[in-house]
Amino acid sequence: MKEDGMAKITTDELIESFKEMTLIELSEFVSKFEEVFKVTAAAPVAAAAAPVEPAAEAAPEKTTFDVILEAAGDKKIQVIKEVRTITGLGLGEAKALVDGVPSKVLEGANKDAADAAKAQLEAAGAQVSVK
């Protein structure tokens, strides 16, 4: 990193910046970080022992997910607020998305972003599925 008179950012300052970002912004950050540093954010998995006989070809693991709002529940206003937070949509667009269930809140998101969005929406009282 260049030291062109710029102050070094502390870990705490980075964390505070992340707290202010939406899930989509964080997902984009992780993707860019992985690209720039040629790393992956996936948790390491312990290697399993090789099977004695060749196993049937496993289905490829899904890497992108859609978050589907199935029902808004009793707390529709809270669900609209969460949809706005997750997607960055305006009030009218978020309301239309919630009113038009089932509807996609996120499309092509990574597993972590999809799970986080699902948890946020469920905490607001919505019924959500990830496909």
UniProtKB/Swiss-Prot annotation:
The keyword NAD does not apply. The keyword Ribosomal protein applies. Keywords: Ribonucleoprotein, Ribosomal protein. One of its GO terms (biological process) is translation. GO terms for cellular component: cytosolic large ribosomal subunit. It comes from the Bacteria. Disulfide bonds: none annotated. GO terms for molecular function: mRNA binding; structural constituent of ribosome. It holds the Pfam family Ribosomal_L12. InterPro entries: Ribosomal_bL12 (IPR000206), Ribosomal_bL12_C (IPR013823), Ribosomal_bL12_C/ClpS-like (IPR014719), Ribosomal_bL12_oligo (IPR008932), Ribosomal_bL12_oligo_N_sf (IPR036235). NCBIfam families: L12. Belongs to the bacterial ribosomal protein bL12 family. Homodimer. Part of the ribosomal stalk of the 50S ribosomal subunit. Forms a multimeric L10(L12)X complex, where L10 forms an elongated spine to which 2 to 4 L12 dimers bind in a sequential fashion. Binds GTP-bound translation factors. HAMAP family: Ribosomal_bL12. Forms part of the ribosomal stalk which helps the ribosome interact with GTP-bound translation factors. Is thus essential for accurate translation. This is Large ribosomal subunit protein bL12. It comes from Tropheryma whipplei (strain Twist) (Whipple's bacillus). The gene is rplL.
